[in-house]
Amino acid sequence: MRVNETNQEDVRNWIKLRLARNLDTFGAIRLLKVFGSAESVLEGSLSDLARTVGMPAAEGVVAVARGAADDDVDAALERLLSNQESGILTIADPLYPAGLIESGLAPLLLFTRGNESLLRREATTICGSASADEEGLRNAEFFGKAISEAGMTVLVPSEPGIPSAAVSGALSAHQGVPPAVLLASGTARAPREMTGLLKALLAAGGLLISAELPEASQSDASKILRDGLLAGFSRRLLVVEAERHAPILDIARRAAELGSLVGAIPGGIHNPLARGANALIREGAM
């Protein structure tokens, strides 16, 4: 959803809820069901709010309603209004990924930059080592291109190596679907090493997605959140190359628990970059 003069106050209220201390997504949803809108939630009394979500979360809502986070809210809203590529999806938006909601991992808001209509398509997540070898990079490019040409969105985390190679493959596809990248930073602060690739992605009609405010920097906490979202974002996840104890293995296992189809590309038994993918195959990955 693009932000304009008509909807900016509603968006402002949603961002305030997102920034309320001690209020998680489930609590926000309960409040929205009881009060009917983000505006009404922010107008609620402390006692009424506390009856629904408890006192700590209620105090967080009252604080943002009184302006506690206005600087951050204003900065986010200014970015959304000034950049025509930028948008926002509330958890109530029809374009909000259903897989995230069903997984129980959904943040209240997703910030976007680029072509939001890609979220209507089926997606396949491709992930793997940031320090991949040549074979791994070739495989990632191959599958990125093939999946794009099959009419699906290639979704990757904002990392070098396998994810970047998969994006390059999708961008090289003949009449393919542009790829999407899930960021650990805000959409206005993409990783420097990926600047050129992400510019090409946006120019080709791709999409950047983040659970962080547009100007937010990447942090350990935001990477953990981003990795959790990867597990629930799509119904298919492919691990191209990963070390034995790589974090992506936990993401793949979580995706399998959520009902996603998980695949892994096997590699040589002496290749340390293949041991993680080989382990997933032994556990039942396709």
Can you say where each PLM-predicted feature lies in the sequence?
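Short, small/acidic-rich helices and loops at N termini and domain boundaries
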Residues: 1-92, 280-283
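Glycine-biased, small-residue-rich flexible motifs in mid-sequence functional cores and linkers
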Residues: 1-10, 91-286
